[in-house]
Amino acid sequence: MHEMSIAISIIDAVAAKAEAEHADTVTIVELEVGKVAGVEVESLKFCFSAAAKNTVAEGAELAVCEVEPVGECEACGQRFPVAFHVATCTSCGSFKTNIVSGRELLIKSITIE
């Protein structure tokens, strides 16, 4: 369950920001998580809640925005939705594609008091 290590890293970053801002409480942590990032969102929420105990983030809401995967074709430059980790271009059929979004795991914002 790598979600626990991710949750702990999020708590560490959030606590550092709260300390830098002289805040006592974190109320909301907003994340962007790509749908092909390999993160189980519900597990992450559970782990976040457990990892936040006895920290400035205890009781904070973890708001997750899931990012749809988008591919880009190296051959024609077309961008297209991706259903799997490997995708063919929907325009020219090329296999030379890259996933350009959908792998994110970002702290988008932190609400502190």
UniProtKB/Swiss-Prot annotation:
Zn(2+) binds at residues 73, 76, 89, 92. It holds the Pfam family HypA. Coiled coil: none annotated. The keyword Metal-binding applies. InterPro entries: Hydgase_Ni_incorp_HypA/HybF_CS, HypA/HybF. Keywords: Metal-binding, Nickel, Zinc. One of its GO terms (molecular function) is zinc ion binding. One of its GO terms (biological process) is protein maturation. It comes from the Bacteria. Ni(2+) binds at residue 2. Involved in the maturation of [NiFe] hydrogenases. Required for nickel insertion into the metal center of the hydrogenase. Belongs to the HypA/HybF family. This is Hydrogenase maturation factor HypA.
